[in-house]
Amino acid sequence: MNVTPKDLLDAGVHFGHQTKRWNPRSKPFVFDHRQGISIIDLGKTHAALEKACTFLEDTVGNGGNVLFVGTKRQAKDIIREAATSTNMPFCVDRWLGGTLTNYETVKRSIAKYKKYQQMETSGDMNKLASKEVAAIKREMVRMQKNFSGIVDMPGLPTAMFVVDVNHEKIAVAEAARSGIPCVGICDTNSDPSTLSHPIPGNDDAVKSIRIIVEAIVAAVQNGLSQRDARRAARGAADLKAAAAAAAGITGETAATPEVDLSKVELPADVAAVVEGEGESEAEPVVAKKKPVRAKRPAVKAE
């Protein structure tokens, strides 16, 4: 992470809310109260930001995705730019209740929106009645506002980043119910315990929001680079294994078995057969029969 505490100071990250609006649970991150304003400890902000960046980098590097949420006026453009540069889903308009806790219904609505877009592109919408086309286009405008940033989201996000915990309290609560880790900027009027990775800082000033979001974007981009490198290495390893397997099969097929001649047993008459001294197939030897002697007649005694 290239952001230093001095950079955070120059961006005004240390300015909290008025002391009368502070949340007692933010006390561990408050350095002092001056002129009725809570001053945030930038040392703790820097440590928390570094920890959050490491978490998001590992999450994205392992194949996860991050949902960027910032619907307040100061954060809209920054969040949209950050999500677009990292190809991540985002929400910069009104948070639609149930986006995380009732995702299956939202997913069907997104599929319907994509169907309308396809009909408009292919010209099939022109085949419908003008009254029906007008109704569909009005619905598409509403869907565009609600789903434009999450149309290509494959499923529930692996993690979520929010700019203002209080302003995005519904989104934060849904993430907690869905078991999704949440990283966010937490001002002195917010409860940091609602986030898994709170970043204490000014969530109202544009400069403060931008410097923190830029650090988050850099971490996500590093995670994407790690993911691509791992996929490339895995692909190369698979190709190498496939080539080795193919070579092994070919070698086994073409190999000639070796014979140890010292262990071959020869028949006893092999020498006679080789030298031609054995029996001939052309003139087989026939065993001679012994002559049979004629029996003499018996002489009777007188």
Curated annotation (Swiss-Prot):
Residues 275-302 are annotated as: Disordered. CDD domains: RPS2. The keyword DNA damage does not apply. Keywords: Ribonucleoprotein, Ribosomal protein. This is Small ribosomal subunit protein uS2. One of its GO terms (biological process) is translation. The keyword Calcium does not apply. Transmembrane segments: none annotated. NCBIfam families: rpsB_bact. GO terms for molecular function: structural constituent of ribosome. Coiled coil: none annotated. It comes from the Bacteria. It comes from Opitutus terrae (strain DSM 11246 / JCM 15787 / PB90-1). PROSITE patterns: RIBOSOMAL_S2_2. Residues 287-302 have a biased composition (Basic residues). Belongs to the universal ribosomal protein uS2 family. One of its GO terms (cellular component) is cytosolic small ribosomal subunit. It holds the Pfam family Ribosomal_S2.
